């Protein structure tokens, strides 16, 4: 895959540029929307949920931002990745290029948006009197795994979308449910231990919790937590690669 990516480096770079420009085409603020969108969502969540869930929670704004930051990246990457094949059918039906390039270009564009939002997140942490420690370097672990997890889910969803167009509506409903099951605006500590363990089945919650442990609690999660995140990522990437390899030759007949 790396050799193929290097061989088509120019095409890949052009796809990333095209996707980024296309997203903000005919907008006045352009890429600034990458910063305003999560900030607006954060503001709404803070106004709505503070009185219900954050009244006695320290650094609740940062707590919300951690959840919103991770979930927004996951949601955007998977939603964009799902349509990556269908949206570029006019290219790969005429030119023989690796189809995963389109998915990777979407993920790189989403990663750029995530990086911009992450800069704003750091500023919010400063305003919220968050203590910066050496543990922040450990955030590279969940970010790296989340990128891979998004790619794996994108491979699965893009393959399914070629054959089943209804998947876009089902995924939209699923992500809405997932948002409420990822403890973005509430704490799982209020639930019984057995219920708290159920949240560990949600990979997105694991990434969110890792961020909060480092940023707010200033602790590094235990080794088993790292292993669980890695396992979820490997499963997603493994299934995604399997589906891509199995159905790759059939995509041309359904787009």
What are these regions, as identified by a protein language model?
Residues 1-255:
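Hydrophobic transmembrane alpha-helices and immediately adjacent juxtamembrane helices
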């Amino acid at each position: 895959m790396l050799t193929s990516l290097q061989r088509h480096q120019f095409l890949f770079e052009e796809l990333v540029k095209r996707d980024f420009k296309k997203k903000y085409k005919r907008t006045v603020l352009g890429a600034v929307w990458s910063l305003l969108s999560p900030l607006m969502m954060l503001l709404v969540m803070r106004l709505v949920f503070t009185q219900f869930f954050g009244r006695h929670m320290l650094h609740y704004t940062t707590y919300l931002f951690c959840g919103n930051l991770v979930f927004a990246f996951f949601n955007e990457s998977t939603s964009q990745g799902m349509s990556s094949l269908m949206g570029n059918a006019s290219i790969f039906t005429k030119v023989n290029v690796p189809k995963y390039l389109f998915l990777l270009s979407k993920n790189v564009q989403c990663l750029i948006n995530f990086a911009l939002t992450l800069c704003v997140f750091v500023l919010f942490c400063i305003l919220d009197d968050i203590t910066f420690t050496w543990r922040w370097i450990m955030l590279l672990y969940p970010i790296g795994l989340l990128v891979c997890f998004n790619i794996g889910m994108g491979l699965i969803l893009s393959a399914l979308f070629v054959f089943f167009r209804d998947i876009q509506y089902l995924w939209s409903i699923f992500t809405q449910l997932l948002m409420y099951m990822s403890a973005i605006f509430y704490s799982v500590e209020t639930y019984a231990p057995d219920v708290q363990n159920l949240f560990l089945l949600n990979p997105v919650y694991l990434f969110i919790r890792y961020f909060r442990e480092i940023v707010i609690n200033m602790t590094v999660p235990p080794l088993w937590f790292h292993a669980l995140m890695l396992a979820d990522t490997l499963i997603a990437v493994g299934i995604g690669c399997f589906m891509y390899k199995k159905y790759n030759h059939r995509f041309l007949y359904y787009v």
